[in-house]
């Protein structure tokens, strides 16, 4: 994502928080919880290098070192929400989503999650199967969570007194190679992976 997108995202978050602060000041009340949809992309890159033991626990975010501008923006915005909570008493709830998937999700164009991209690649193969491209060696692990479970977890957080951050994802880790094998089996199409390093 470009810098303008990051700027827009930060501006939106700041405007939401600032408007709530002003409203609370005028009304003398502070009852509206504000939800922030964070991302596991804010975790340090070095925490995720070992595919057999990624460290994405909520307390492992620091020292900060996300691997993309998107991750840095998510981390900054999360800190912004916590600052407004501390300094202005605004009740916030903060999540860190891990690879949420389901219907109506993006499935092409380069912004799709791994399950959608792999399903699309396999679906586009002829009935006899073929080759699909996989980034990296395929041993990188991910936690995937279906959208309905994500919504339920988010709702529970909103109903609780805990502000977060809370990881919302599956405890089960799946390698990209395993995901391609599952997709191949379900589709009934044999595949060979071309690993793009």
What is the meaning of each model-derived region?
Residues 1-5:
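Conserved small/polar residues in nucleotide/adenosyl-binding loops
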Residues 6-10, 56, 62, 66-78, ...:
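Short-chain dehydrogenase/reductase
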Residues 7, 11-68:
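Conserved Rossmann-fold NAD(P)-dependent oxidoreductase catalytic core, especially the SDR/UDP-sugar
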Residues 10, 14-18, 79, 116, ...:
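Conserved active-site region of classical short-chain dehydrogenase/reductase
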Residues 17-19, 23, 65-98, 117-128:
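Active-site Tyr-X1-5-Lys
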Residues 33-38, 93-99, 133-136, 143, ...:
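Structural signature of the Rossmann-like NAD(P)-dependent dehydrogenase/reductase core
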Residues 42-44, 68-69, 93-115, 140-141:
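Flexible, glycine-rich beta-alpha linker
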Residues 124-197:
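C-terminal substrate-binding subdomain of Rossmann-fold SDR/epimerase-dehydratase oxidoreductases
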């Amino acid at each position: 994502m470009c810098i303008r997108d990051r700027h827009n995202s930060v501006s939106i978050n700041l405007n939401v928080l600032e408007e709530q602060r002003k409203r609370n000041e005028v009304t003398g009340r502070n009852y509206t919880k504000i939800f922030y949809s964070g991302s596991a992309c804010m975790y340090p890159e070095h925490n995720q290098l070992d595919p057999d033991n990624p460290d994405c626990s909520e307390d492992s975010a620091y020292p900060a070192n996300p691997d993309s501008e998107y991750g840095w923006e998510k981390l900054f915005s999360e800190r912004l929400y916590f600052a407004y909570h501390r300094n202005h008493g605004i009740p916030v709830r903060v999540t860190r989503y891990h690879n949420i998937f389901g219907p109506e999700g993006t499935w092409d164009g380069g912004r799709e999650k791994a399950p959608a991209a792999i399903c699309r690649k396999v679906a586009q193969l002829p009935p006899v199967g073929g080759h699909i491209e996989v980034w990296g060696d395929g041993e990188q692990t991910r936690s995937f969570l279906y959208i309905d479970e994500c919504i339920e977890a988010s709702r529970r957080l909103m109903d609780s007194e805990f502000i977060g951050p809370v990881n919302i994802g599956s405890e089960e880790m799946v390698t990209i190679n395993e995901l391609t094998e599952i997709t191949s089996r379900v589709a009934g199409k044999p595949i060979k992976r071309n690993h793009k390093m």
